[in-house]
């Protein structure tokens, strides 16, 4: 299915019944990373697994910015008239969720995994790897990770949604960055998942579905 927002087409799959749950993937991925999780969540939620702009079956873009992606999600919720929304974002999707929840009161529960506030919120080895990729190939997805996000911790104080901040103990995001996010959102809960990496409990995994249902139901 497609929704027209901000002059582009966002592709999404709608599955299940119940409270709306928006799920947004990370950089260079698409909605299919959530297939296994949606299969579990569909009995409790209406899942909207979305391809963000420049990804999957959504409109391609020559240049990408997290703020634009966040505005897309806000417009998506408005277009479909979704209220009392659970927003789950992984990696880049988590960044988008933080930006959207600052101003969108349709989001009443926010769960983010492996998000960062600044490019240096990732570990040094990952930044070196991304820099090398940028030398080999000019790609808006790589450029996005190199120059963004640029979120000040103080900006997160406007988030009113009940928030759960997640990361793996072996995540490519620095733990100090994850803790800073949680500390900057009023009332946020923090969970560092022992033994998990950036996407091990999310990508084609039912583990994230178990975490979400435990937290929300």
Model region roles, listed by residue range:
Residues 128-154, 170:
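Hydrophobic, aromatic-rich cap/lid helix
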Residues 159, 165-167:
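Short beta-strand/loop motif that positions the catalytic acidic residue
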Residues 172-177:
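Conserved alpha/beta-hydrolase "acid-adjacent" motif
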Residues 27, 85, 89-90:
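Conserved alpha/beta-hydrolase "nucleophile elbow" surrounding the catalytic nucleophile
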Residues 196-205:
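Catalytic histidine-centered segment of alpha/beta-hydrolase-like enzymes
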Residues 48-86, 210:
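Active-site loop/oxyanion-hole signature of alpha/beta-hydrolase fold enzymes
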């Amino acid at each position: 299915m497609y929704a027209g927002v901000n002059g582009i087409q966002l592709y999404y799959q709608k599955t299940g019944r119940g409270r709306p749950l928006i799920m947004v993937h990370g950089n260079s991925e698409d909605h299919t990373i959530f297939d296994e999780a949606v299969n579990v969540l569909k009995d409790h939620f209406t899942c909207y697994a979305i391809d963000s702009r420049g990804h999957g079956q959504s409109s391609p873009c020559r240049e990408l910015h997290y703020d634009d992606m966040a505005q897309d999600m806000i417009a998506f919720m408005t277009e479909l008239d979704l209220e009392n929304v659970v927003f789950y974002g992984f990696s880049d999707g988590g960044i988008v969720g933080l930006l959207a929840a600052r101003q969108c009161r349709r989001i009443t529960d926010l769960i983010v995994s492996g998000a960062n506030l600044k490019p240096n919120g990732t570990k040094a080895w990952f930044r070196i790897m991304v820099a090398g990729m940028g030398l080999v190939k000019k790609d808006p997805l790589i450029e996005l990770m190199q120059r963004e996000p640029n979120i000040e911790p103080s900006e997160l104080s406007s988030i009113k949604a009940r928030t759960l901040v997640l990361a793996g103990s072996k995540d490519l995001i620095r733990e100090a960055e994850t803790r800073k996010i949680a500390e900057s959102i009023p009332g946020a809960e923090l969970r560092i998942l022992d033994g998990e990496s950036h996407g091990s409990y999310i990508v084609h995994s039912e583990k994230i579905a178990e975490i979400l249902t435990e937290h929300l139901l």
